[in-house]
């Protein structure tokens, strides 16, 4: 089993390396305008610059004559470091990218925690009380489809351009999904759990804390997984527009846009995707799988 997973992982890595190699090779052959669509080397240079180093892998590999044509098999003496040693300018952890990632993760943890608490209580309420479900269910479904950046103007006008505004956008963009997913998951909870709980005297608060909440763990795990993705997208949308003292990953994307650095734009987008994939792969997917396996729901 482990060998199969290793082979699959190596195959995936090989395919991606092939794609990147073809992409870089096409740029070197056709030499399109890199400020319109960057090659992987330009993206690499931009990301390295954001962590305090300086490289020029995107420069021509071959020397260039007076007419601007490449001289085959004659290396460019300035590639890839312009004759300078590779050295860190400043502190690694205080450089732009690590500092921005740390800021965004702290904001995400706070906003996502609030979303989980709100989604948990409102999701349980919609499951328990038909009136609340009829009142809030359709509205929450509609608000769940609303792009998170639509909350930004309201946040700016009501709360100002500050950390509270970004927190508001993050929470409003994610907790509807958590509440709806939890409610729908609780609805398909086997009725035998409820009946057994009532038979053994679980009433009132105990019914929810000792019966429904444990029985609803598969639904809760699924709601956390979907809610995280909504929270991360909402936070990135808010940081893209809000300009604060503490710069997040979304702000680096906005800076790349303002300065026309398409390499930085693509590189920061890659970091956004990488963080989301890592959180899902190493936290939420294993959590959901473990809970489903515990309740005999795993495939």
Residue ranges of model-derived segments:
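Periplasmic/extracellular loop-to-transmembrane helix junction in inner-membrane transport proteins
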Residues: 29-113
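Loop-to-helix entry region at the N-terminal start of transmembrane alpha-helices
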Residues: 99-108, 157-178, 264-271
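Transmembrane-helix boundary motif in ABC transporter permease subunits
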Residues: 110-140
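Generic hydrophobic transmembrane alpha-helix motif, especially the helices
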Residues: 137-177, 184-185
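Transmembrane alpha-helices
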Residues: 168, 172, 204-238, 267, ...
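Short cytoplasmic-facing helical segments at TM-TM junctions of multi-pass membrane proteins
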Residues: 178-223, 249
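Hydrophobic alpha-helical transmembrane segments of polytopic membrane proteins
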Residues: 248-287
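Short cytosolic juxtamembrane segments of multi-pass membrane proteins
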Residues: 285-299
